[in-house]
Amino acid sequence: LSAKEFDEIIKRIDDSECTIIDVGSSNIEQFLVQMNEYQGSHDLIDYFIVPVVREAKQQIDSIQTITTLMAMGVEQDRFKVIFNLAEKDTPINKQYSVFLADDVCKEIVGENPVVVYHNNIFNILNKSGLQYDDVYNDNRDFRSLIRSASSKEERQDLSNLRAVKMLMNGFNSDLDVAFKNLNLV
């Protein structure tokens, strides 16, 4: 749905027990305009999850989004910030320094930041033509399969699949920690 279809968004919120509204960066301004026109509509939303990336301009945009929503009456404790596409080898406070320089945003983040680290899993899946669910649910014993493979090509294919599975396992573990740190009720 487009942000302009705000009445339909409200209906869908009311039609379900739990709704996640993903407002892309290209729709955020229109979404905020509509939310302001439909006064009190922010009360239909339990949490506002704000993904923040490393680029300074986007960090400034995220601060502005939070500021605008707070001016509409959204309480500070209803915000959840996700530091997205973070690098594991650089401290979070350096990667997101613009965002964390804002006192309100820093307070929202708290002591246990929610972090989703950059990972090449989706590029690898795309290049190899593999589906996320297929790899995720593949519980074969790759070690045994590789040892019993009848050709070098089969061993390489199985070894590549195992490497993708291992990368996905690491990514999923990071997501589990991030979800836990969201502290959703």
Which residue stretches match the model-derived regions?
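Beta-strand-loop-alpha "switch" segments that mediate conformational coupling across diverse proteins
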Residues: 99-158
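Nucleotide-state-sensitive switch-loop elements of NTP-binding domains
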Residues: 1-28
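Well-ordered, non-membrane alpha-helical segments in soluble/globular domains
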Residues: 34-35, 59-67, 90-103
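C-terminal accessory extensions appended to soluble enzyme cores
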Residues: 154-185
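Inter-motif core of Ras-like GTPase G domains
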Residues: 11-18, 32-56
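G-domain G4 guanine-recognition motif of GTPases
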Residues: 52-55, 78-97, 114-132
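Conserved C-terminal guanine-recognition region of P-loop GTPase G domains, centered on the G4
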Residues: 38-42, 54-88
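Phosphate/oxyanion-binding active-site loops and adjacent basic polyanion-contact surfaces
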Residues: 2, 24-28, 57-62, 171
